[in-house]
Amino acid sequence: MTPSSVFNSPSCRATGARVLLSMLMTVLMCAPALAEPDAVVYKLQDESTIPSGPEGDAIRLGKMLLTDTRRKLPQHVGNGLNCSNCHLGAGTQPHASPWVGLIGAFPEYRARSGKLISLQERINDCLERSMNGKALAFDSVEMNAMMSYMRWLSADIAPGKPIPGRGFVKIDTRLKPDASRGEKIYAAKCAACHGAEGQGVPDGAGGYVFPPLWGKDAFNVGAGMARHFTAAAFVLKNMPVGQAGSLSAQEAVDVAGYFTQQPRPDFPASVKDWPN
């Protein structure tokens, strides 16, 4: 029997098919599960695509308000933070609560509110809680500018499509926090930027180079980042700066268990949260 006849025999072809199928299944099983099968992988918009005229002006203003919030919206910010302190990369970084795709995701049911809310309501949630400030009018120039920026970020994404990296990475909520271990991790890994007392590093202009994690200029008790596992999920994927991913899930849970329990501004309206 010639080599070619061996390779073309039914038994050889069947064996080859089984091997190929096995290899394919191995690849599929080992591939990282980024999101649902119909999720889209977004590409970041290039600023050269911002149009000229009023629409482009609104997009640029929106980005400025979201990245320099304390200085540009002093009447609506009650602490030293900017929106981009948590929404990293001007709202483009995966697993740092990016704004990419949000235009098509809202209205959305929020368990904390116990109802369907608009994106404008979600923005105001952040202003009142994370920024310890005041809500914007839905028809204000500033709100419309923020919406314009988020719409531009989402330009290539069909409404309703799952977005890989939306929100924060999932973390095992069965992990038990140890605040004493967390205090040691904070001192070793976090204090250089956020301060030994969580006070942050001032920028000399009333804001912060690195934001405070507790105290009067930090997010209030109603903010998502004041919730233990939300903070741990953010830390796990994004901190420390320049060493993201260097902490284990347990370390992230421990350090979040430490800093979320420190004193911060109150938010009386939080008694109405999670109504269902």
Q: For the regions a protein language model found, what residue spans apply to each?
A:
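Boundary at the C-terminal end of the N-terminal hydrophobic targeting segment
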Residues: A33-P37
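Extended surface/linker regions that mediate inter-domain or inter-protein docking
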Residues: I117-K184
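Extracytoplasmic electron-transfer domains, predominantly the class I c-type cytochrome c fold
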Residues: P54-L61, L65, Q93-L136, M146, ...
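Conserved non-transmembrane functional hotspots
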Residues: V271-N276
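Bacterial N-terminal signal peptides
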Residues: R18-A31
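The canonical Cys-X-X-Cys-His
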Residues: G62, G80-A90, M146, G182-G198, ...
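N-terminal secretory signal peptides that target proteins for export/translocation
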Residues: M1-T15
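Electrostatic cytochrome c docking/interface patches
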Residues: V40-Q75, S154-Y186, V201-P202
